């Protein structure tokens, strides 16, 4: 069905009609039913009001259960402009900024119902319900009839409207995508200022994390009126531990604070907070996460009974007080309770969908909902399950009985009752772990509990509470047994155990989906069962169940490199090594699924890396060049504007004055931007592709080598000066660093790796966060391995102590080769060591104790690689045949800039990328006319192997990409719309079993199809596409393209039109520079701060 949006700019949108049921605009609802009810064959229509997580769960379950009878048609009306998205994962939006990544189902799902009518409205609100006529009225004026009405209107975030200043600019709530987008926009314009989250519950911690992840605010503070966070889920001990962990992460938490007033300026902008205790706090932004209010406004005019605390009152069948109207999710009030977490809503969806589709079976009842939660909040694992406050409030239930709502707390107040609950508590202040489990007085039944830091046993314990079976072990074993560690394991769980509370998925659901053949990958399991698509906390357990079920069926869980290679990276390495396969074609014929496959952007670089790790060929040799990522293809890192960086090797950070002069002369001659790197060398940016050969010729003549900054290989070995100069030095760190860098330079590995050597325990070279690091001792060096910085920093681990200098090399040889042999694709040593069975102790056994008996072989392999070393740039500049690769265009010597250059701090750089790309339908553009035009000689392209070659050509002001694949030609625009980068001709070509080809953009891996009916479509980002053109080789030796007139071509695809220009992006320092303009110090200039006159401080005062 088409997307049905509500009014935008005054528009009115009306949905389509099905099965004779009209949707009429502006007609009295009493006239609408007509003869509809008299048709005995018609399907009943269910109208769902709301399109959130619970609503879409209900629809999915209803469709599945109604697949045979096909009794119902469905209309769903959503108020937001988006289809249903994962509100639990809302904070991840800050990372990817793509709403599509949050969609619970792709847009195509909404049009996939072939056996029933399914309509959906977006941007449309239901304003009235007419139960007597069974119709609803929308904000567009449409009248929609129903047989069954399901209210899933959700809830609104609460704002403290009685607090002065609650309506100021800078006040936000954390509830919807639009809330986040407004917060992001505000934060971008208030960089460096203070943001505040009010509310210490689940939503408040999520909001605080989101504001922190924005990285725009200078600081973020959390305000909570309670004595500890998560007061509804945790007791004082547990909540205080979570508070401590959050503070350790850098978030300031203020407890027992109530907002009395919000301070504002004359323009009603937030400037601060006044608390009830008189304390004040300066801030520019306040995000309130203090609770939710059920959306029950439709109840007033409709006559639906609503609870005093809000929400449509429902019974155990989810019925409201009005016939044929049901309520589910956060808008429903059951026994005077509403539920702000998703699990009870999913349970309601289960009950209602079952009852509507199984009228001949015993109906399900919505009884005591499971309010258990397991989450990772600000990096802290938190869980509560069962009756987790039974010790504080008294048990809500006891095995074998369930007290009514009225009987709880109805005992004689003058009678002192015996406690009915015993608590078993475990605290580990060193590991940051807290557990409290609540049992009946005899210890035979588990009632509930809470966990901080270690939540592995959550699923098992929660199931024990639900089953209400007597325990088979004493309570003490629940604490002591949890200390054995290990991954989450589902082997001893019953099939009825709920593993995903967000979507009420049991272990049996996952097992059945795999055994039936419906799900063959973990992605299939997520799509089919919805497990793991909510908060994601259940994924380790889901993965464990999937793996075990596949193994039980005799099927191995795939860790294949890609669709073309049925081996893991480590297995493929062994196949290539043992069979001595030396080319991509040899590998595909011997190890690929299809011998003549082109491979893809995943397997090509991986195979190229393995071949380099084993045989060290030159990357620019014909049979290897087309396998490389763009950086390796041109022996330089590609930058934002299509230029490249130039990084000579500076071993150990030591460099002579002559080489510094040579670098400076090259940078000045070619107008390169210079920067000192963290690896103690000089990076020169802005080198044009056509200048790379000349630049490197001068550097090679000056005695310099490639620094391999472009490669998945050794980058640098950083050092402090050690005993070379430092009076505190214990060892010669520079000498050792230079020897290590000279030995391992150019060695290809699964990922880049870095080293460092410190001359003493002061650790100035930061050796303990490198892939390998040495720290000098009085007896030699301590060797550390498996560390890295980056997005997920890891401290390295000690491999060996007090190693003499002459014994360092054998140990590192074995370590590096073992990593190369066994790591997964693109896996850093940190992640490799974490996933290595046995971890550091196993690595010591292999590397130090030669447990596998391969130490000598690994040393020999490393020595062969070291002996095969050559400088890639030295060999390249001496080979004139490689010059053709270093041209901007294959058909002309002209050059153009793809991004406008700006001058800053006496250097040049490309201007900032704008936020949005080129959002035009290039694929669907209709040209006025097309004619065949010769563009380039056919002999430019290779006849293979490899079976691929490409070229970037210039036609007018337009850049075009031509690809030769297995003897056929394909042509597209050169610009990738994502970031308006002109690079597609340098992208890797992939194929599938159906003969479909695609080119993968070198920048961010957008894959564009080259052939077939969908040529030009982006496979992994439907928001963009590219233009394609007919192309062929003719007998005259030229390649011809069918193109429009040059003027028309340039008007759509011209470089000048799409070149990124200054001013398109927001200057990130605009606010900073405006605020601190002119503050340069007394000696920066005679004028001092702009607009003020310099003054002399009295001589007898301190001049601060």
UniProtKB/Swiss-Prot annotation:
User: What top-level class of enzyme does the UniProt entry assign?
Assistant: oxidoreductase
Q: Does the keyword tRNA-binding apply?
A: no
Q: Which residues bind siroheme?
A: 764
Q: GO molecular-function annotation terms? A: 2 iron, 2 sulfur cluster binding; 4 iron, 4 sulfur cluster binding; heme binding; metal ion binding; nitrite reductase [NAD(P)H] activity
Q: Which cofactor does it need?
A: siroheme; [4Fe-4S] cluster; FAD; [2Fe-2S] cluster
Query: To which pathway does this protein belong?
Result: Nitrogen metabolism; nitrate reduction (assimilation)
The EC number(s) given in the record are 1.7.1.4
User: Is Flavoprotein one of the keywords?
Assistant: yes
Q: Where is the composition biased (Polar residues)?
A: 1094-1104
Q: Which family does it belong to?
A: Belongs to the nitrite and sulfite reductase 4Fe-4S domain family.
- Naturally occurring in which organism (per UniProt): Emericella nidulans (strain FGSC A4 / ATCC 38163 / CBS 112.46 / NRRL 194 / M139) (Aspergillus nidulans)
Question: InterPro entries this protein is in?
Answer: BFD-like_2Fe2S-bd_dom, BFD-like_2Fe2S-bd_dom_sf, FAD/NAD-bd_sf, FAD/NAD-binding_dom, NasD-like, NiRdtase/SiRdtase_haem-b_fer, Nit/Sulf_reduc_fer-like_dom_sf, NO2/SO3_Rdtase_4Fe4S_dom
Q: Which residues bind FAD?
A: 44-79
Give the PANTHER family listed for this entry: NITRITE REDUCTASE (NADH) LARGE SUBUNIT (PTHR43809:SF1)
Reaction catalysis annotation: NH4(+) + 3 NADP(+) + 2 H2O = nitrite + 3 NADPH + 5 H(+); NH4(+) + 3 NAD(+) + 2 H2O = nitrite + 3 NADH + 5 H(+)
Q: Which Gene3D superfamilies match?
A: BFD-like [2Fe-2S]-binding domain, FAD/NAD(P)-binding domain, Rieske [2Fe-2S] iron-sulphur domain, Sulfite Reductase Hemoprotein, domain 1
Q: Locate the residues binding NAD(+).
A: 146-176
Q: How does the cofactor bind to this protein, according to its record?
A: Binds 1 siroheme per subunit.
- Report what the protein is called: Nitrite reductase [NAD(P)H]
């Amino acid at each position: 069905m088409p997307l049905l949006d509500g009014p935008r700019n005054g528009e009115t949108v009306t949905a389509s009609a099905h099965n004779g049921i009209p949707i009429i605009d502006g007609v009295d609802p009493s006239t609408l039913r007509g003869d509809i009810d008299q048709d005995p064959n018609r399907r009943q229509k269910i109208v769902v009001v709301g399109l959130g997580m619970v609503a879409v769960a209900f629809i999915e379950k209803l469709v599945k259960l109604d697949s045979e009878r096909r009794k119902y048609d469905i209309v769903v009306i959503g108020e937001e402009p988006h289809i249903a998205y994962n509100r639990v994962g809302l904070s991840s939006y800050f990372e990817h900024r793509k709403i599509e990544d949050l969609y619970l189902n792709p847009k195509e799902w909404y049009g996939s119902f072939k056996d029933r009518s399914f309509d959906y409205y977006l941007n449309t609100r239901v304003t009235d319900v007419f139960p007597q006529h069974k119709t609803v009225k929308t904000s567009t004026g449409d009248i929609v009839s129903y047989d069954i009405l399901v209210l899933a209107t959700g809830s609104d975030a609460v704002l403290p409207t009685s607090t002065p200043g609650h309506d100021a600019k800078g006040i936000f709530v954390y509830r919807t995508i639009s809330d986040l987008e407004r917060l992001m926009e505000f934060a971008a314009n208030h960089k460096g200022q203070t943001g505040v989250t009010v509310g210490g519950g689940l939503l408040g911690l999520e909001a605080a994390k989101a504001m922190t992840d924005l990285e725009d605010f200078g600081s973020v503070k959390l305000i909570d009126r309670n004595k500890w966070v998560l007061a509804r889920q945790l007791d004082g001990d547990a909540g205080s531990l979570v508070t401590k962990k959050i503070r350790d992460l850098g978030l300031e938490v203020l407890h027992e604070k109530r907002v009395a007033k919000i301070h504002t300026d004359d323009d009603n902008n937030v400037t601060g907070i006044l608390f009830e205790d008189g304390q004040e706090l300066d801030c520019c932004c306040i995000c309130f996460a203090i609770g939710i209010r059920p959306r029950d406004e439709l109840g007033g005019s409709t006559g639906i009974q609503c609870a005093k605390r809000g929400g449509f009152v429902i019974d155990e069948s989810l019925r409201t007080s009005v016939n044929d109207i049901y309520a589910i999710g956060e808008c429903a009030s059951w026994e005077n309770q509403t539920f702000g977490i998703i699990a009870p809503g999913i349970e309601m969806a289960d009950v209602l969908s079952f009852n509507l589709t199984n009228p001949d079976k015993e109906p399900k009842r919505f009884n005591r909902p499971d309010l258990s939660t397991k989450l990772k909040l600000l990096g802290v694992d938190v869980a509560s399950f069962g009756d987790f406050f039974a010790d504080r409030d008294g048990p809500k239930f006891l095995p074998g009985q369930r007290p009514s709502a009225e009987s709880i707390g109805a005992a004689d107040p003058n009678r002192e009752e015996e406690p009915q609950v015993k608590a078993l508590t475990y605290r580990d202040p060193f590991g940051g772990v807290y557990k409290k489990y609540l049992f009946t007085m005899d210890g035979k039944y588990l009632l509930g509990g809470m966990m901080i830091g270690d939540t592995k046993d959550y699923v098992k314990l929660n199931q024990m509470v639900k089953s209400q079976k007597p325990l088979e072990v004493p309570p003490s074993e629940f604490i002591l047994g949890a200390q054995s560690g290990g991954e989450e394991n589902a082997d001893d769980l019953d099939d009825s155990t709920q593993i995903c509370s967000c979507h009420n998925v049991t272990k049996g659901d996952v097992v059945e989906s795999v055994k039936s053949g419906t799900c063959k990958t973990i992605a299939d399991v997520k799509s089919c069962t919805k497990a793991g698509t909510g908060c994601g906390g259940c994924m380790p357990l889901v993965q464990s169940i999937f793996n075990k079920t596949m193994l039980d069926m005799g099927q191995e869980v795939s860790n294949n490199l890609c669709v073309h290679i049925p081996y893991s990276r480590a297995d493929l390495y062994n196949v290539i090594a043992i069979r001595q396969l030396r080319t991509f074609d040899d590998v595909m014929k011997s190890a690929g699924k299809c011998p003549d496959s082109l491979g893809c952007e995943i397997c090509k670089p991986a195979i190229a890396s393995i071949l380099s790790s084993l045989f060290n060929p030159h990357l620019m040799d014909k049979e290897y060049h087309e396998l490389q990522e763009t950086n390796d293809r041109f022996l330089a890192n590609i930058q934002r504007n299509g230029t490249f960086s130039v990084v000579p090797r500076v071993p150990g950070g030591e460099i002579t004055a002559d080489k510094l002069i040579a670098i400076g002369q090259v940078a000045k001659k070619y107008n390169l931007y210079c920067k000192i790197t963290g690896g103690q060398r000089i990076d020169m940016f802005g080198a044009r592709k056509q200048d790379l050969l000349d630049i490197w010729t001068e550097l090679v003549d000056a005695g310099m080598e490639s620094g391999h900054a472009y490669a998945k290989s050794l980058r640098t070995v950083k050092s402090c000066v050690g005993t070379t100069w430092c009076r505190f030095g214990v060892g010669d760190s520079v000498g050792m660093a230079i020897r290590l860098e000279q030995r391992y330079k150019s060695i290809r590995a699964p990922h880049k790796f870095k080293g460092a050597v410190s001359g003493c325990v002061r650790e100035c070279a930061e050796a303990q966060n490198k892939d390998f690091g040495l720290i000098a001792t009085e007896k030699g060096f301590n060797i550390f391995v498996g560390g890295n910085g980056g997005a997920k920093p890891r401290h390295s681990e000690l491999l060996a102590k007090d190693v003499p200098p002459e014994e360092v090399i054998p140990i590192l040889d074995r370590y590096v080769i073992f990593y190369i042999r066994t790591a997964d694709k693109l896996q850093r040593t940190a992640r490799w060591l974490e996933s290595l069975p046995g971890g550091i102790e196993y690595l010591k056994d292999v590397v130090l104790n030669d447990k596998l008996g391969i130490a000598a072989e690994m040393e020999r392999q490393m020595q062969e690689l070291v002996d095969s070393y050559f400088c890639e740039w030295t060999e390249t500049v001496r080979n004139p045949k490689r010059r053709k690769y270093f041209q901007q265009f294959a058909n002309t010597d002209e050059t153009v800039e793809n991004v406008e250059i700006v001058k800053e701090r006496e250097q040049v750089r490309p201007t900032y990328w704008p936020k949005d790309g080129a959002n035009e339908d290039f694929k669907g553009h209709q040209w006025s006319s097309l004619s065949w035009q010769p563009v380039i000689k056919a002999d430019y392209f290779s006849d293979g192997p490899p079976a691929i070659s490409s070229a970037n050509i210039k036609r007018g002001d337009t850049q075009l990409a031509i690809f030769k694949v297995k003897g056929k030609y394909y042509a597209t625009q050169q610009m990738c719309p994502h970031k308006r980068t002109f690079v597609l001709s340098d992208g890797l070509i992939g194929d599938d079993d159906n003969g479909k080809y695609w080119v993968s953009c070198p920048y961010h891996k957008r894959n564009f199809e080259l052939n077939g009916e969908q040529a030009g479509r982006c496979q992994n980002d439907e928001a963009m596409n590219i233009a394609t053109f007919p192309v062929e080789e003719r007998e005259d030796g030229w390649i011809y393209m069918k193109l429009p007139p040059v003027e028309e071509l340039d008007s759509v695809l011209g470089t000048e039109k799409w070149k990124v220009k200054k001013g398109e992006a927001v200057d990130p320092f605009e606010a900073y520079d405006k605020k601190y303009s002119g503050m340069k110090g007394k000696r920066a200039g005679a004028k001092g701060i702009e607009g003020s006159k310099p003054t002399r401080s009295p001589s007898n005062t301190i001049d601060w």
